[in-house]
Amino acid sequence: MSLLEYISDEDLFNEVETLLTKAKKKKDAAEKTFTSNVIDPFGALFEAPGFSSHEEWRNSELARQQQKTIQNHVGTFHQKILGHVEGWRDMGIGGIVDLLNEERRIIAEVKNKYSTVTGGDLADKYKGLDELVSPKHSRFKDYCAYFVNIIPRKPTRYNSPFTPSNKGSGTLCPSNPNIRIIDGASFYELVTGRPDALQELHSALPHAIEYILSERLGQQGFSIPDKDSFIKYFGLAYG
């Protein structure tokens, strides 16, 4: 039985491996260049009281750099996972859109967190989506465009017209039922038809991560420490 009902284990494992490999390369590079990079000597001293040794502080700094790499690529991970769902296509990094479903006439731009794009840049995203689904655009005419925030600002679901503030005029962008903003849990349900699809992915990831690290990346017997404590963060983000 597959870990997830909506994509194969091999597709899930491959995407997990891609992300973990990027993180490992970043960590290895950071270790090699740690002393050659400019470290804030003042900040390091103010951080020192929070650690029991310089080695502990150094490991924390390396972990922080690795964490930043992971966070920068998690949005792409979701894009690729959803692109494996039947009927959906991942358009790749730098594509005109992130996800496409021609049969359902849906396009989507996927961001990992509500704070990835903020302020006046949101109006630019609206404008870009508006141009894509406008009658003048032959390929996506009359499609529904979604701006997806996988992690919402608050733990509530939403799927509503996308009306960010226009930085030029100070007014809201016009409401259009075919230009929408949606949280990650709701979008996963829209894509898969499964109300808890995003939580199912989150629950499957510990096994997938342990398998990839142990079987493909040379960390035999790896197990995520204190797994239940990490699992609880899903409820805080999504309610």
Curated annotation (Swiss-Prot):
GO terms for molecular function: DNA binding; type II site-specific deoxyribonuclease activity. Pfam families: RE_Eco47II. It catalyses: Endonucleolytic cleavage of DNA to give specific double-stranded fragments with terminal 5'-phosphates. Keywords: Endonuclease, Hydrolase, Nuclease, Restriction system. Its EC number is 3.1.21.4. The keyword Hydrolase applies. The keyword S-adenosyl-L-methionine does not apply. One of its GO terms (biological process) is DNA restriction-modification system. It is an enzyme of class 3 (hydrolase). It comes from the Bacteria. A P subtype restriction enzyme that recognizes the double-stranded sequence 5'-GGNCC-3'; the cleavage site is unknown. This is Type II restriction enzyme Eco47II. It comes from Escherichia coli.
